Amino acid sequence: LTSGGSEIKARLVEFIEDAGLADSNIEEASVLVAGGRGVGSADGFDKLRELARLLGGNIAASRGAVEEGWISKDYQVGATGKTVTPKIYFACGISGAVPHVVGMKDSEIIIAVNTDPAAPIFDIAHYGIVGDLHKVIPELIEIIKETGK
């Protein structure tokens, strides 16, 4: 797996059978794949939905993505949204502003993907990937599909 010319070493630890996407009850999800303004558009959430589906989780969003009109407020995490505590929280294109972080900081594992190495989300992430989510997420999806068969 490579991103931006750098190699990313990945290993599938566990494959969770495709459980489909749940409704907007993100508080109950064990895996959340969240997108922020860095997703770039409503269509940008398509790959996040696919990753969430493969992991048996759900999607979520930052206030910025909701304000852009890319996703319903039902999926918003943070001070003006919902508080979540999943086992795994993917923060994709989310800067890590305090109002968002207060709603997800107690997640067991936080994985951040952002092009800005100084993004505050990396301060709380257990794992971080500095790279373009539009390259990293599709590569991760392919790894899961290849190793999950």
Segments from the language model and where they lie:
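N-terminal glycine-rich FAD/FM-binding segment characteristic of electron-transfer flavoproteins
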Residues: L1-K149
